[in-house]
């Protein structure tokens, strides 16, 4: 072997070791992520999004599950629609729930669906889920409330705490700041208790008032965008009154699926028992995020018309 050949061999050997070290380092980093061993996620939509589209489900994975290590850090995974509450064959499994404008009865019905869907996943795949390989359950807005309600029922059914991991965006039931723990007191201070009670009852919200995401039942990661008038209802109310909340409802609360991975990463993280809060900075292009969420990533294409019609049906007939 010539001197040049020996030199090239040494370079190749060093490169090989560097590559192996890089792979091992990457694997160790992933092993620390809460969803590193999870390869199945149940995906639910928010209000007026009863059946998340493929674009919705993949955006949820790319932006909010991928940073937690889901399915080895996968993006663009295949999507299937669950048959009722029965599992289907894809990493991202879409669960259809009502997601009506009347969030009280709608959330309670969706909570029943979540419980059945989780039970059916465990029954169909005995031994598939564990602390190392948890079943992931994703919720946005109203469905985060439904999943929060479902947690106590799942615990009562004997589903082990470490076998599930919930991931929420725009959680209305976020302790201290969310809309459901705070709206009654805040509206009372502006409108008086009589009018507040009438409005909340007429809009079908009374069934979820005071609901809080449990911090002691199942590991939960909650992403909140600064200014979100639902997840950060209390801060918006204190800084801008009801108009601040309304703006945050129709602007930041809509933008989650239109964020970029870099914007999601621009966040501060804190823990509260089993909850990990990821607070995302609003230092973004709001117009781009809003338009991308609505028209590219499924916010307007996940059953909007069906949900509105069902909401009208419920308003007229008290059933859906």
Provide a role label for each language-model segment:
Residues 27, 103-107, 136-140:
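Short secondary-structure transition/capping motifs
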Residues 137-152:
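Gly/Ala-rich beta-loop-alpha elbow adjacent to hydrolase catalytic centers
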Residues 33-130, 153-320:
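Surface cap/lid and interfacial helix-loop subdomains adjacent to catalytic sites
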Residues 1-31, 166:
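Secretory targeting and sorting signals
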